[in-house]
């Protein structure tokens, strides 16, 4: 039987400016942020959360992403794609049962279509918006990453399906947290021997967002962004969860990384 574990992994970094992450801050200063993704191992099949950057940006960033590279430049080694890192840990990609998407922005879609037996779980609102984004959001969605034939999708419907229990045993619960993206969701991970972990993903890029000291540099709705953080803070308080923000370089460095794990 496979132990229930959470592995924290990273698919390179993004080079950008402070104000791209913390609205109206930084005076144009350069900033480099990690691009995390997560592997949950489970006796009923494994889960990838997001998958980070698509491996194609390791060799042809501008060819794959286009003009958004002028704002966010991906740095990724050719052997650090999602699938290669899962294999390096000794896991068979065919044993991945779920690919769970927080949202469909370009630095979170590296697992879609890469695991042959996976059901892809995403918010319906996010999936639909990704095909017809508004002008200000279009650069963040790379359609060829998620518009792939033959994939199995499972759609969640906002508050109607909130706190969806992926395995049915409490290990992985989705939390609808729109604002950064139309259909963003965060995740509560409960493990046998560790305190719960609340993966905010991009509902809170950094601890500044979490502590309500700054707004994200990109958002679809300011009001929803603020209210989603408030919702997640309440959940963290009630569950005693350790909070893992989405792209905070300093905070990310404090967590165990694969091959170490939480269990």
From Swiss-Prot:
Gene Ontology MF terms in the entry: acyl-L-homoserine-lactone lactonohydrolase activity; metal ion binding
UniProt remark on cofactor binding: Binds 2 Zn(2+) ions per subunit.
Keywords of the record: Hydrolase, Metal-binding, Plasmid, Zinc
Reactions performed catalytically: an N-acyl-L-homoserine lactone + H2O = an N-acyl-L-homoserine + H(+)
Residues involved in Zn(2+) 1 binding: 103, 105, 180, 202
UniProt cross-references to InterPro entries, sorted A to Z: AHLLactAttM (IPR054889), MBL_superfamily_lactonases (IPR051013), Metallo-B-lactamas (IPR001279), RibonucZ/Hydroxyglut_hydro (IPR036866)
Binding site for Zn(2+) 2: 107-108, 202, 247
Cofactor annotation: Zn(2+)
EC code(s) of this entry: 3.1.1.81
PANTHER family assigned: 102 KBASES UNSTABLE REGION: FROM 1 TO 119443, QUORUM-QUENCHING LACTONASE YTNP-RELATED-RELATED
Family per similarity comment: Belongs to the metallo-beta-lactamase superfamily.
NCBIfam families: AHLLactAttM
Protein name: N-acyl homoserine lactonase AttM
Native source species: Rhizobium johnstonii (strain DSM 114642 / LMG 32736 / 3841)
The encoding gene: attM
């Amino acid at each position: 039987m496979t132990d229930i574990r959470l592995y924290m992994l990273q698919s390179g970094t993004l080079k950008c400016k402070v104000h791209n992450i913390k609205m109206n801050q930084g005076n144009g200063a350069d900033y480099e942020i990690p691009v995390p993704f997560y592997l949950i191992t489970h006796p009923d099949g494994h889960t990838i959360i997001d998958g980070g950057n698509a491996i194609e940006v390791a060799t042809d960033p501008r060819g794959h992403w286009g003009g958004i590279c002028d704002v966010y430049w991906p740095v990724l080694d050719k052997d650090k794609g999602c699938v290669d890192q899962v294999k390096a840990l000794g896991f068979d990609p065919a044993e991945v049962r779920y690919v769970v998407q927080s949202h469909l922005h370009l630095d979170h879609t590296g697992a879609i279509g890469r695991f042959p037996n996976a059901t892809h779980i995403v918010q319906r609102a996010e999936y639909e918006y990704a095909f017809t984004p508004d002008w200000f959001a279009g650069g963040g969605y790379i359609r060829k990453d998620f518009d792939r034939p033959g994939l199995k999708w499972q759609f969640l419907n906002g508050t109607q399906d909130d706190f969806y229990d992926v395995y049915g045993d409490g290990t992985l619960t989705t939390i609808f947290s729109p604002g950064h993206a139309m259909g963003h969701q965060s995740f509560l991970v409960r493990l046998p021997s560790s305190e719960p972990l609340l993966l905010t993903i991009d509902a809170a890029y950094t601890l500044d967002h979490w502590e309500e000291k700054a707004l994200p540099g990109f958002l679809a709705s300011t009001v929803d962004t603020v209210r989603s953080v408030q919702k997640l803070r309440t959940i963290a308080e009630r569950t005693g969860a350790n909070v893992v923000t989405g792209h905070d370089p300093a905070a990310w460095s404090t967590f165990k990384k694969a091959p170490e794990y939480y269990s």
